[in-house]
Amino acid sequence: MSETNRIQQGRVISDKMDKSIVVAIERTVKHPIYGKFIKRTTKVHAHDEDNTCGLGDKVEIAECRPLSKTKSWTLVKVLEKAKI
């Protein structure tokens, strides 16, 4: 088993929970028949210990041990604050 954590970047789509955020990770996949590249989105719950993230922020998250039923990611850093 690898010792390195999986790191992803995404946008915060919800910050209403205490010490938790929901991050949308966007990726492109090639359609198996037509060959066109399509955007696909995955939503993951991440741990935000200090409640530093806001809605629309671009963040970097890393995979960790399961923290709850749905949380297996933790916030590494905020890459870009949302323009309000």
Swiss-Prot record:
The UniProt record lists the keyword RNA-binding: yes
Annotated organism of origin: Vibrio atlanticus (strain LGP32) (Vibrio splendidus (strain Mel32))
Keywords, alphabetical: Ribonucleoprotein, Ribosomal protein, RNA-binding, rRNA-binding
Subunit structure comment from the entry: Part of the 30S ribosomal subunit.
Gene, per the UniProt record: rpsQ
Domain of life: Bacteria
Signal peptide (from-to): none
Chain's role: One of the primary rRNA binding proteins, it binds specifically to the 5'-end of 16S ribosomal RNA.
Coiled coil ranges: none
Gene Ontology CC terms: cytosolic small ribosomal subunit
NCBIfam families referenced in this protein's UniProt entry, alphabetically: PRK05610.1 (NF004123), uS17_bact (TIGR03635)
HAMAP family reported in the protein's UniProt record: Ribosomal_uS17_B
The family this protein is said to belong to: Belongs to the universal ribosomal protein uS17 family.
Pfam families listed in its UniProt record: Ribosomal_S17
GO molecular function: rRNA binding; structural constituent of ribosome
InterPro entries: NA-bd_OB-fold, Ribosomal_uS17, Ribosomal_uS17_bact/chlr, Ribosomal_uS17_CS
Descriptive protein name: Small ribosomal subunit protein uS17
Protein's UniProt keywords contain RNA-binding: yes
One record GO biological process: translation
